[in-house]
């Protein structure tokens, strides 16, 4: 298997005016692409690894040879994280979750607005580069953040929603205004896909 960029289900400018075309194009064709390239380089010569989906590699880092484990953690994580991120977005996004995910959020966090507040705080508080996540852990929802391209999958948690807070994800449009970028994220979330992912993760 050769790892490849996932096909985006929308054009680079489809999320305007929320997320700008230039950032989306650079983020996808440059940043995500280099993770895919470097992951393929890392597993080259390891046929037993190259046959596994990226998420499976990241979820089982202990099974990766030590000499390439760091590269798989970084670049496999970057590939898995960004693949989920793109699927989290939609030009017809926004609003709120429905169904089982809505019920689980309200059960765990109180209201949707209270959940948003806690998620925003996790994203804003991540020092330097990283991610904020809504994950399923032992059947329950949690909000966590990870550094760099570390994935919740490596901790046995299943990500449902992820927000990239590396500066490359927002700096061209928002400069140093990370909280504004975080607030804008809610306008483009594809809740239909998040609902499906939650149902599959339970």
Curated annotation (Swiss-Prot):
Keywords assigned: Manganese, Metal-binding, Oxidoreductase
Entry superkingdom: Bacteria
E.C. number(s) listed in UniProt: 1.15.1.1
Any one GO cellular component localisation term in the record: cytoplasm
Cofactor note: Binds 1 Mn(2+) ion per subunit.
Pfam families, sorted: Sod_Fe_C, Sod_Fe_N
Ligand binding (Mn(2+)): 27, 82, 164, 168
Catalyses which reaction(s): 2 superoxide + 2 H(+) = H2O2 + O2
Gene3D superfamilies, alphabetized: Fe,Mn superoxide dismutase (SOD) domain, Iron/manganese superoxide dismutase, C-terminal domain
Quaternary structure and interacting proteins, as annotated: Homodimer.
Protein task: Destroys superoxide anion radicals which are normally produced within the cells and which are toxic to biological systems.
Similarity field: Belongs to the iron/manganese superoxide dismutase family.
Protein's recorded name: Superoxide dismutase [Mn]
Organism name: Listeria ivanovii
Lineage: Bacteria, Bacillati, Bacillota, Bacilli, Bacillales
């Amino acid at each position: 298997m050769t790892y490849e960029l996932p096909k985006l289900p929308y054009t680079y400018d489809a999320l305007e005016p929320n997320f700008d075309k230039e950032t989306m194009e650079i983020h996808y064709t440059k940043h995500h692409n280099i993770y895919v390239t470097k992951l393929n380089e890392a597993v080259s010569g390891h046929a037993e690894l190259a046959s596994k989906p990226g998420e499976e590699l990241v979820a089982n880092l202990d099974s990766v040879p030590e000499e390439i484990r760091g590269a798989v953690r970084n670049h496999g994580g970057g590939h898995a994280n960004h693949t989920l991120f793109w699927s989290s977005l939609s030009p017809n996004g926004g609003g709120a979750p429905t169904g089982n995910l809505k019920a689980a959020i309200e059960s765990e966090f109180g209201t949707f607005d209270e959940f948003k507040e806690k998620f925003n705080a996790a994203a804003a508080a991540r020092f330097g580069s990283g991610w904020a996540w809504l994950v399923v852990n032992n059947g329950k929802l949690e909000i966590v953040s990870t550094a760099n391209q570390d994935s919740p999958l490596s901790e046995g948690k299943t990500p449902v929603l992820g927000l990239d807070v590396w500066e490359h994800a927002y700096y061209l449009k928002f400069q140093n205004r990370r909280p504004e970028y975080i607030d804008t994220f809610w306008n483009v979330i594809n809740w239909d896909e998040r609902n499906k992912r939650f149902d599959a993760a339970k």
